[in-house]
Amino acid sequence: MAKNNVVKAQGTDLYFIDPDTHVVMNAGCITSLSGIDTSIDQIETTCLNETARSYVAGLATPGTATFSINTNPQDPVHIRLLELKNAGVSLDWAVGWSDGTSAPTAVLDSSGEYDFDVPADRSWLLFEGYMNSFSFEFAQNAVVTSSIGIQVSGEPVLIPKSTS
């Protein structure tokens, strides 16, 4: 039986807000994206008279997201990503799912910060984080690629596509 209730990865876009210009930039030809996650720490609540440990949920610990690109030193977005990684600045990120094609915009919020304004005709995963690695890979019979790590800060927010 064919499954029609899946979302394909092909057609996914990764965006970030440039902190200097407040322009939304598309990371371009990403080839993979993973690890946008938080794990829940455990707090032990075991009493000495118990024979098995017991726990309650603690704080969420954000993980490290990773995305890969076919690196091009002539692509101004790739150069800007490397500059921002080297500066260690935290960025707002938006993953646009393949169930739509609209791009987000940046809007000034009431506290004077720029945030994403995401169209309702596409699903979104929003998160904050700084790039903590930007490696270059050179291999035989291949294009130059980069694997870029993002230390996620806070809880990612999933915004489903509007059904209306």
UniProtKB/Swiss-Prot annotation:
Note the superkingdom of the native organism: Viruses
The primary site where this protein sits is: virion
- Please provide, in alphabetical order, the Gene Ontology terms of the cellular component aspect for this entry: virion component
UniProt keyword terms in alphabetical order: Virion
The keyword Magnesium is assigned to this record = no
InterPro entries from the entry? Answer: Phage_TTP_11
Q: List the coiled-coil residues.
A: none
**TM annotation in the entry:** none
Entry's localization field: Virion
Question: What role is this protein assigned?
Answer: Structural protein.
Q: What is this protein called?
A: Structural protein 3
